[in-house]
From Swiss-Prot:
KW Aminoacyl-tRNA synthetase (keyword) present: no
EC annotation from Swiss-Prot or TrEMBL: 4.1.1.31
Family named by the database record: Belongs to the PEPCase type 1 family.
Listed GO MF terms: magnesium ion binding; phosphoenolpyruvate carboxylase activity
Originating organism: Pectobacterium carotovorum subsp. carotovorum (strain PC1)
Protein's UniProt name: Phosphoenolpyruvate carboxylase
Classification via Pfam families: PEPcase
Cofactor: Mg(2+)
GO biological process, one term: tricarboxylic acid cycle
Gene behind this protein: ppc
Enzyme class name: lyase
Role description: Forms oxaloacetate, a four-carbon dicarboxylic acid source for the tricarboxylic acid cycle.
């Protein structure tokens, strides 16, 4: 195994040395010596040397205020460089890319070997493949965009250094560039000074498309084509759209007053502007490349007739002109200038597709397939994947905002208070109004600001070019009327198309009731007629885990999906399940392949729709090569889940999970909700209060400014526990429940479930990953430094529970150590721990010092923020 990681360790060592040189040049030998002493002590401490652990604590506690910031920055920047080397390792010929068989080809081999599948079954599954990745602006990307660009270039340099035939001067040039990039990073503030706006977040999303996905998606589809041809002898249809991207940036207003109707309108324009800009660049390349004169009669006519010498170029130049005028018009709109749209304004994907596809068909017909399947095919694939909107937008709003808006309308009209009506009365009113030809909204009525905002958002949707809005998601959906209310508000706004409206079920009770709600909805004739046989439902992972703990939440999510699949199948409805997963385990995060194969059978028939959140976007799609790998993983897993589904779990496994769910939920809530010491302990032992000062995202950390834990959003809740290494939301309750079932004599049954049921084995695997990242001595150190002594018994209780949980999980998985079956992740965690541990100790020290001061010193605060960023990099996830 050491050989497999030697190239990565060599890169980490080289980058560390270059960072050391930069620090020495900037701050002198003394600071570098101090950093190096701390690193060596940390490494020895990790190896079990207790004396060096105490020396590490003493050294960090004795740092002067002047030394705190440079030491924190050194370890934080080193972790960013380590992550970059690790990301390169996943795509390097010396790393994971070489040691793992190609993900697609191995999946296709498994499909071919199955005696139950015909080639037609496989072909149909491939051609109906649907992966929709929803990029969200959850405030978990802590690394500044300016630093991300530098780290991407560091990755490029590592790739160049891997070439065996480099001349000495070429290698020296690359090393010089690496030194420059590391020096630039060191002399750049790693902490944002101001909180990003929703428009800034949307621009970050567009930058991911421009810098990675624009190249990565066509490259992935070429790879898929080649693997299909090798395995089955056919290629993807040119118009296949296996991958699409949607965004919540600029559309997600749930709990974020900064996302207004005007912001959404602006982001929709910005998205179209960026699409026109990117397609214009593509077309300019094609103008240069498509210089051929031979073509079909149909194309010659399209190009302008027999006088045209270079018909392909003529068509490309016409498209170039159209894109230029579209770009100019959208630029004017973005600056607030009212201008008549040009006659050739690009509004639909077909306006781009038809001339490009005509060129493609002509080239194929004239024996120039090699040219057709080059950059022209890439552009056609981009039209299908991104299109004129670039990324479609989801609008998300909380259910009570719609209820309050309708209540204001009914009170004004003298119909009573909608909010106080029974569910059956609400439904009767909504169906009557949805079926009515007359408008509900009074003409000259002046609504309150909140209601006006809800209605204005619906009007933005109604006026948006068709295809630019993907869905309307209702958070905290609890009843059929929550869904019908949105349909009515959209109708009143003049929405002429049937926009998918997805209820989001996210608490334990709501997940348990999801099937009842959808059964009631599907029994309404008007609703069945309106949705035309298609329904989207979103499953919330983060809030359910915060509400009930991970074990109870994951079982409720599984059961809700299973019930919804069966209900929709029975009703003849095509169900798309939309998974609201986060990057961390406490918010539903899991390695993609394991997560997909652990879903209930049939859950991916309608395709995969899943959120990609915060820092996970960079880890999974930050480079074109990483994008190819991530999409290949998803593709292989979806095809296997649909064509080779796991067997239905046994009834007794269901019963064991019911018991695990009940016991774990009771224990989790016993601590989080019922123990009066828990909230004071949480506030003292974690940097929860200090996290609010980090300008991470546009959304406030709390739903209600003065609320307790229950009002805290799932992201800062998990972020805080990740920082002090107790990782509590990702395990509390789970191990105790497993122990109870073992004590009841069912260990063999648990081992069987772990062996034969992907859902359960994935849960155990996720617990192992959390335990590998958690750290008992660091969590104890936070308590000693920050927590009132009278709360220490609670901290000890939680740490003892964590230690017991680790033992029970190892007993069930029959392993001697954590992550035995995922050595790559274990190696990755071990590599980063040496640099994360000093940051944790430093963070506890900084929290201790800053909490002693009435007005914390600005340098102390900055150093604290740097440690938070560094620990986030070390843990590879924040919230």
């Amino acid at each position: 195994m050491n050989e497999q990681y030697s190239a990565m360790r060599s890169n980490v060592s080289m980058l560390g040395k270059l960072l050391g040189d930069t620090i020495k040049e900037a701050l002198g030998e003394n600071i570098l010596d101090k950093v190096e002493t701390i690193r060596k002590l940390s490494k020895s401490s990790r190896a079990g040397n207790e004396k060096h652990r105490q020396e590490l604590l003493t050294t960090l506690q004795n740092l002067s205020n002047d030394e705190l910031l440079p030491v924190a920055r050194a370890f934080s920047q080193f972790l960013n460089l380590t992550n970059t080397a690790e990301q390169y390792h996943t795509i390097s010929p010396h790393g994971e890319a070489a040691s793992n068989p190609a993900q697609l080809s191995s999946a296709f081999e498994r499909l071919k070997e199955s005696k139950d599948l015909t080639e037609r079954d496989i072909r149909d599954a491939v051609e109906s493949l649907s992966i929709e990745l929803v990029l969200t602006a959850h405030p978990t990307e802590i690394t500044r965009r300016t630093l991300i660009h530098k780290l991407v270039e560091v990755n490029t340099c590592l790739k160049q250094l891997d070439h065996n035939d480099l001349a000495d001067y070429e290698r020296n040039q690359i090393m010089r560039r690496l030194r420059q990039l590391i020096a630039q990073s060191w002399h750049t503030d790693e902490i944002r000074k101001i909180r990003p706006t929703p428009v800034d977040e949307a621009k970050w999303g567009f930058a991911v498309v421009e810098n990675s996905l624009w190249e990565g998606v066509p490259a992935f589809l070429r790879e898929l084509d080649e693997q299909l041809e090798q395995a089955f002898g056919y290629r993807l249809p040119v118009d296949a759209v296996p991958v699409r991207f949607t965004s919540w940036m600029g559309g997600d207003r749930d709990g974020n007053p900064n996302v207004t109707a005007e912001v959404t309108r602006h982001v929709l324009l910005l998205s179209r502007w960026k699409a026109a800009d990117l397609f214009l660049r593509d077309i300019q390349v094609l103008v240069s490349e498509l210089s051929m004169s031979e073509c079909t009669p149909e194309l010659l006519e399209l190009a302008g007739g027999s006088e045209v010498q270079e018909p392909y170029r003529a068509i490309m130049k016409s498209l170039r002109s159209q894109l230029s005028s579209t770009l100019s018009y959208l630029e004017a709109r973005l600056t607030g200038e009212e201008r008549l749209p040009p006659k050739d304004l690009l509004i639909t994907n077909e306006q781009l597709w038809e001339p490009l596809h005509a060129c493609y068909q002509s080239l194929k017909s004239c024996g120039m397939g090699i040219i057709a399947d080059g950059r022209l095919l890439d552009t056609l694939r981009r039209v299908r994947c991104f299109g004129v909107p670039l990324v479609r937008i989801d609008v998300r709003q909380e259910s009570t905002r719609h209820t309050e808006a309708l209540a204001e309308i009914t009170r004004y009209l003298g119909l009573g208070d909608y909010e106080s009506w029974s569910e059956s009365d609400k439904q009767a009113f909504l169906i009557r109004e949805l079926s009515s030809k007359r408008p509900l909204l009074p003409r000259y009525w002046e609504p309150s600001a909140d209601t006006k905002e809800v209605l204005d958002t619906c009007r933005v949707i109604a006026k948006a070019p068709q295809g630019s809005i993907a869905a309307y998601v209702i958070s905290m959906a609890r009843t059929p009327s929550d869904v019908l209310a949105v349909h009515l508000l959209l109708k009143e706004a003049g929405c002429s198309f049937a926009l998918p409206v997805a209820p989001l079920f996210e608490t334990l009770d709501d997940l348990n009731n999801a099937d009842d709600v959808m059964t009631q909805l599907l029994s309404i004739d008007w609703y069945r007629g309106f949705i035309q046989g298609k329904q989207m439902v979103m499953i919330g992972y983060s809030d359910s885990a915060k509400d009930a703990g991970v074990m109870a939440a994951s079982w409720a999510q599984y059961r809700a999906q299973d019930a919804l699949i069966k209900t929709c199948e029975k009703a003849g409805i095509a169900l798309t399940l939309f998974h609201g997963r986060g990057g961390s385990i406490g918010r539903g995060g899991a390695p993609a392949h394991a997560a997909l194969l652990s879903q209930p059978p049939g859950s991916l028939k309608g395709g995969l729709r899943v959120t990609e959140q915060g820092e996970m976007i960079r880890f999974k799609y930050g480079l074109p090569e990483v994008t190819i790998s991530s999409l290949a993983l998803y593709t292989g897993a979806i095809l296997e889940a649909n064509l080779l589904p796991p067997p239905e779990p046994k009834q007794e496994w269901h019963e064991v999970m019911d018991e695990l769910s009940r016991v774990s939920c009771d224990m989790y809530r016993g601590y989080v909700r019922e123990n009066p010491d828990f909230v004071p302990y949480f506030r003292a032992a974690t940097p929860e209060l200090e996290l609010g000062k980090l300008p991470l995202g546009s959304r406030p950390a709390k739903r209600r400014p003065n609320g307790g834990v229950e009002s805290l959003r799932a992201i800062p809740w998990i972020f805080a526990w990740t920082q002090n290494r107790l990782m509590l939301p990702a395990w509390l309750g789970a191990g105790a429940a497993l122990q109870k079932v073992v004590d009841d004599g069912k260990q063999e049954q648990l081992e069987e479930m772990c062996r034969d049921w992907p859902f359960f084995s994935t849960r155990i695997g996720m617990l192992e990953m959390v335990f590998a990242k958690a750290d008992l001595w660091l969590a104890e150190y936070y308590d000693q430094r920050l927590v009132d002594e009278k709360l220490w018994p609670l901290g000890k209780q939680l740490r003892d529970q964590l230690a017991a949980d680790i033992n029970i999980v190892l007993a069930i998985s029959n392993d001697d150590h954590l992550m035995a079956d995922l050595p790559w992740i274990a190696e990755s965690i071990a590599l980063r721990n040496v640099y994360t541990d000093p940051l944790n100790v430093l963070q506890a020290e900084l929290l201790h010092r800053s909490r002693q001061q009435e007005k914390p010193d600005a340098d102390l605060e900055l150093a604290l923020m740097v440690t938070i960023a560094g620990v986030a990099a070390g843990m590879r996830n924040t919230g």
